[in-house]
Design a protein with these regions (language model features):
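Hydrophobic alpha-helical transmembrane segments of polytopic membrane proteins
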Residues: 190-202
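Polar-ligand-bearing catalytic/cofactor-coordination segments
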Residues: 3-180, 199-273
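Loop-to-helix entry region at the N-terminal start of transmembrane alpha-helices
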Residues: 181-188
Length: 273
């Protein structure tokens, strides 16, 4: 049921965005890509701010983490590292998966940390704090903002290239059109852009793996290396992760380094402190 809900929600949002792009194209012509870029960028920023507040409740139940030892440890660690944190929530991820996870979402007053109930069940409080130290590392290193800006820039370049090619008769003719059709130009561009997207994906994955190492190093620098390693091991077990993926497969598809590589890097960072 949840997969169907997610599919139809994605279909709805994607349809709205595509309709907006088509209407902007019809109304503005040559520079439609600029306006479309603005619309998509605004939507991306809006979702980054309010995803957890507006979208997550459609699929999961979120409740504030109750007062107690775990909340105190999280708040104390955040305070010690100069990280302002008020909103801490627990999500019922166990109703669909056994995977344990935690993540930060939003910015400014909408910033919140979300813990899966499976994470609370499987990890010790110290391990949970260590996992959150890793996430705080992403924020302190500005990884989240950098990735968002890179994504917005990538979207702008893609739309600009699309604007250069969409009115080319050859694209529509290649798909059987007798004249220029926006829809045929769109389909042809998607086909042509797919290899470019794959190359960009290689770069983004490599960048993401680098950021994961940096966030791990930040956590290790806070004195929680041992708990982070033990926590990552438990998370890996619940996720049924491959400990020794083929190097080329990891290079192409992995946004996170394999567990053994992360552990080795954390131990090096910890020993150098």
């Amino acid at each position: 049921m949840y997969k169907r809900q997610g599919f139809f929600l994605s279909l709805l949002i994607g349809g709205i965005i595509l309709t907006a792009v088509v209407e902007v194209y019809r109304g503005t012509g040559t520079y439609f890509w600029y306006y479309a870029w603005g619309i998509i960028s605004f939507f991306s920023l809006f979702m980054a701010l309010f995803y957890s507040r507006l979208i997550v409740p459609l699929f999961n139940k979120q409740i504030p983490l109750e007062a107690g030892s775990l909340r105190d440890k999280i708040e104390n660690f955040a305070r010690r590292t100069g990280f302002k944190l008020k909103n801490i929530y627990v999500i019922d991820g166990s109703k669909r998966s056994t995977k344990a996870n935690a993540y930060f979402t939003g910015f400014g007053p909408e910033k919140r940390v979300v813990l899966y109930d499976t994470l609370i069940k499987e990890l010790t409080e110290e391990e949970i704090v260590a996992v959150l130290a890793h996430e705080i590392g992403h924020y302190r290193k500005h990884h989240t903002v950098q990735f968002m800006l890179a994504s917005i820039l990538q979207t702008g370049i893609m739309l600009w290239l699309f604007s250069l090619l969409v009115n080319e008769p050859a694209l529509s003719e290649a798909l059987g059109g007798e004249r220029v059709y926006f829809q045929l130009g769109l389909v042809a561009f998607v086909l042509l852009y797919t290899p470019v997207s794959m190359l960009i994906g290689l770069f983004m994955n490599a960048w993401s793996r680098k950021n994961e190492y940096e966030a791990d190093a930040f956590a290790a620098g806070q004195g929680v290396a041992k708990d982070l390693i033990s926590g990552l091991k438990k998370i890996s077990v619940k996720a049924l992760s491959n400990l020794t993926p083929h190097p080329w497969y990891e290079f192409v598809y992995y946004s996170h380094p394999s567990l053994l590589k992360r552990i080795a890097a954390i131990e090096r960072s910890s020993s150098s402190e």
